[in-house]
C-alpha cells in the first residue's frame, strides 16, 4: 500500500516576501519608501485582498475609508517635491486607486426637482377624480369644468364602458356554475345506486303510462261480477232465480 506523506509547513516568517502580479519578482525590503514599485506592489496586494474577500459591501470599512476627492485634497496639501518624477508617481497612484461607493453610482443632475414632480402628479390624479365625480353626478359633459377634452373622454369611457369591450360572466346570464362535490361525485357505489334509482323511476313511469282509462264496458263487467259474487239467500235459492251462470231457455249461458 502507498504510504501517506505529510509535508511540513515551513516558518512563514523566514520565507521571502514576494509580490505577484507584476512581470518581475522583487524583495520589498530592498526597495526604498519613495520607489514607485513599492507603491504599485502595495496597491496590487490591496486589490488582491479585496478581490478574494467576501462578496458584498462592508459598511464599517467604507465609513473608515476616505473618498476619492478627500484623497486628492490630502495629496494636494502635502509638500510638493521638486522632481517631476514624484508628481507623476502621485498622479499614477491616484488613478490606480479603487473606485469608492460614491463613484459607482451616477451623480444627480438636479435637472428635475423630485418634490415638484410628485406634487404635480398628485394634483393631476386628484383633478381626474374630481372630474369623474362631477360627471357621475351631473351626467353631462357640459358640467365639467376642464380644458382638456382628452381626459374627459377617457373618464367617460371608464365610467360607461362599451358593452362589446368585455365578456359577460356566466353567472350574470343565469348559468349555474359547476360545483365540486368532492368524494361523493367520484364514489363508484353512489354512482351505481343513482343509476339503479333512475332505472326504477323509468319503469314505474312506463307502468303508469301503460294503464288505460276505465270505460263503460269495464264498469258493467265489474258490476256483473259483484252481483255474481253476492251471497245467495234461501228464497232465491228455492226459486232458482240466482245461479252462478244464468241459463236461458234456448240453452245458452253467459
From Swiss-Prot:
Region: Disordered, residue numbers: 69-90, 195-216
GO biological process, one term: mRNA splicing, via spliceosome
Gene: tls1
Any one of the GO CC terms: spliceosomal complex
Record note on disruption phenotype: Leads to abnormal splicing of introns featuring long spacing between the branchpoint and 3'-splice site. Decreases protein level of genes involved in chromatin organization. Sensitive to cold; simultaneous knockout of cay1 or sde2 leads to a growth defect at both higher and lower temperature.
Primary location class: cytoplasm
Organism: Schizosaccharomyces pombe (strain 972 / ATCC 24843) (Fission yeast)
Pfam families cross-referenced by the UniProt entry: Hep_59
Record's subcellular location: Cytoplasm; Nucleus
Keyword entries, A-Z: Cytoplasm, mRNA processing, mRNA splicing, Nucleus, Spliceosome
Subunit structure as annotated in this protein's UniProt entry: Component of the spliceosome. Interacts with brr2.
Designated name of the protein: Splicing factor tls1
Biased composition range(s): Basic residues: 195-204
Family annotation (PANTHER family): SPLICING FACTOR C9ORF78, TELOMERE LENGTH AND SILENCING PROTEIN 1 TLS1 FAMILY MEMBER
Protein family membership: Belongs to the TLS1 family.
Role this protein plays: Plays a role in pre-mRNA splicing by facilitating excision of introns featuring long spacing between the branchpoint and 3'-splice site. Assists the splicing of several components involved in chromatin organization, such as several shelterin complex subunits.
Compositional bias ranges of the Basic and acidic residues kind: 69-83, 205-216
InterPro entries assigned: Tls1-like
Signal peptide limits: none
Amino acid at each position: 500500500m502507498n504510504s501517506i506523506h505529510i509535508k511540513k509547513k515551513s516558518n512563514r516568517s523566514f520565507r521571502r516576501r514576494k509580490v505577484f502580479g507584476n512581470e518581475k519578482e522583487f524583495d520589498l525590503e530592498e526597495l526604498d519608501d519613495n520607489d514607485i514599485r513599492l507603491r504599485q506592489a502595495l496597491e496590487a496586494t490591496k486589490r488582491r485582498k479585496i478581490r478574494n474577500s467576501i462578496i458584498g459591501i462592508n459598511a464599517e470599512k467604507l465609513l473608515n475609508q476616505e473618498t476619492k476627492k478627500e484623497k486628492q485634497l490630502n495629496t494636494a496639501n502635502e509638500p510638493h517635491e521638486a522632481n517631476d518624477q514624484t508628481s507623476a508617481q502621485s498622479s499614477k497612484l491616484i488613478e490606480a486607486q479603487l473606485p469608492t461607493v460614491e463613484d459607482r453610482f451616477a451623480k444627480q443632475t438636479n435637472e428635475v426637482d423630485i418634490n415638484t414632480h410628485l406634487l404635480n402628479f398628485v394634483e393631476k390624479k386628484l383633478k381626474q377624480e374630481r372630474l369623474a365625480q362631477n360627471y357621475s353626478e351631473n351626467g353631462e359633459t357640459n358640467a365639467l369644468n376642464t380644458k382638456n377634452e382628452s381626459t374627459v373622454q377617457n373618464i367617460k369611457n371608464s365610467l360607461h364602458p362599451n358593452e362589446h369591450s368585455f365578456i359577460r360572466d356566466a353567472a350574470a346570464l343565469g348559468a349555474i356554475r359547476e360545483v365540486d362535490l368532492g368524494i361523493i361525485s367520484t364514489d363508484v357505489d353512489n354512482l351505481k345506486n343513482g343509476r339503479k334509482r333512475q332505472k326504477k323511476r323509468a319503469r314505474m313511469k312506463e307502468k303508469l303510462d301503460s294503464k288505460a282509462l276505465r270505460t263503460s264496458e269495464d264498469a258493467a263487467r265489474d258490476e256483473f261480477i259483484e252481483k255474481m259474487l253476492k251471497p245467495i239467500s234461501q228464497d232465491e235459492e228455492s226459486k232458482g232465480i240466482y245461479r252462478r251462470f244464468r241459463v236461458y231457455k234456448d240453452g245458452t249461458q253467459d
